[in-house]
Amino acid sequence: MQINRREFLRISGAGAMTLFLSGCGLSALLGSEENKAAGTIPEKGSISGGKAMKIVVITSSPHPKNESTSYYLADRFTEGAKSAGHEVFTFDAANSDTHPCRGCDSCHMDGPCVFKDDIEQTLMPKMLEADMLVLVTPLYYYGMSAQLKTIVDRFYSRTSKLNHKKSVLMATAYNSADWTMEALVAHYNTLVRYMDWQDAGQVLAIGCGSRSLVESSAFG
């Protein structure tokens, strides 16, 4: 079914979602647990377990915020989550002081990392206390952006401490072929399995090559 921006905001606040955007038109198969009143904290049985969550949203587009398609979706998700009573922290991986993991193993997978950058000092404490992690990326060569991959690789320093969280994948792509997101979703699903996360949903926007296309779509 087609749903509009208000529905997206409501769903993002209410819990699990499986959304697929084609040509910036939104199609979704939604269970009854997602059909909660707008602006309410999810009822018991939804993805939140009936309580307000701490959510970390990690954006990773190198484009300016006002031009980024993926950032637009992240903003809409954040708006819906906050309106439902959840606490949201957003980290901009593309415009922060970050360093890729160098494989030194000084952390022994239990921290701290040798890099005292924004990942270690700002993002990691928020992720450790979060109930849900939201990974937001433009699709680059059929995978996540290098900026997001840098964050994911740095999970190594706290692997076990980041286990057992809920997660969401949000991605935008110019290509509109039905196989466009297959490689990214496969990577994400593998990450979910390895980290023992609970997948709370995916927003996969194909055929959305510009900010204006997204803004003039069901989300506008």
Go through each PLM region and give its residues:
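N-terminal secretory signal peptides and thylakoid transit peptides that target proteins
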Residues: 1-16
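N-terminal beta1-alpha1-beta2 submodule of the flavodoxin-like/Rossmannoid cofactor-binding fold
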Residues: 24-136, 142-158
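Hydrophobic/aromatic beta-strand patches that form the interior of the parallel beta-sheet core
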Residues: 56-58, 89-91, 168-171, 200-203
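Short histidine/acidic/glycine/proline-rich micro-motifs that form metal-
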Residues: 62-65, 140-142, 174-178, 209-210
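Charged helix-capping and loop-helix junction motifs
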Residues: 149-156, 182-187, 217
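Short, glycine-/small-residue-rich phosphate/pyrophosphate-handling segment
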Residues: 163-201
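Glycine-rich phosphate/pyrophosphate-binding loop and the adjoining helix
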Residues: 189-220
